[in-house]
Amino acid sequence: MKKIIYLLIMFFSIGLLSGCEKTETKMDNINIYTTTYPINFIINKLYEDHAKVYSVYPTGVDVDKYELSTRKLEEYSKSDLFVFNSLDKDRDYAVKMINLNSKLKVIDVATGMKYNNSIEELWLSPNNYLMMAENLKNGLAEYITNPYLVEEINDKYKDLEYEISKLDANLTEAITSAKYKIIVTDSDIFKFLEKYGLKVISLEDNKDLSTNKIEEVKNLIKEKQIKYIYSTTSKTNDTVTKLIKDNNLEQITINTMHSTDGNITNSNENYITIMTNNINELKKELYK
């Protein structure tokens, strides 16, 4: 009788171990697809030891203009997890992929978020980016039942939270303590900085670009309050080009990271270093 009980206990124990192993490997060594670099950076920070992470976009394409084919969507729908931004066209891809594979796991990094001018402010604002990171952490926790793996992700999130919070503090301090609190840009993307107390004059080529706004910038240049114009690319609009040429201004290009690789040029660069450099570039005008 004792032998039978012993065998039953052993059988039950093996069953439990098998169940645990299945749970642990369910979200281990998986294939994850993302879209742009800011999402890719977070998932790698939190989960790179347990997954291979890819972008649905080919390297170097314009993610705003590129459209995924049905064949590619079918291919990506067979992956384990798709991490997307529901405030971008990613949402349409997520819907199509789920329709192709109802078992596909998905995480929306933009849950509960919104933007006012441009989608880039979701990650160029460290405060917003921290929300994206938290959404991703919580999304992973919904799929992972291994408590040790959840704890590992939470620990990595705390490290990332510290780094992003430090960026937010540095940006806040840079603007709060600045002698000059006005910048001129060629894009509304930079308007998120108004929440930090900065006056942003956007010369984006649209219906809001008035003669009065251009004259305001010219007066600020005469008063030596403006020395730089901030852009998202090296190519800017005609109005800004003329202002730069006529007034000997310097154009500063800010990396918005809205691409598959974040416009990274060397292996030492990442979201943290790029944002640190962006803040330092901003200081050139604020502390001239």
Task: Please place each PLM-identified region on the residue numbering.
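Extracytoplasmic metal-acquisition and chelation regions
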Residues: G19-K288
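Sec-dependent N-terminal signal peptides of Gram-positive bacterial secreted proteins and lipoproteins
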Residues: K2-T23
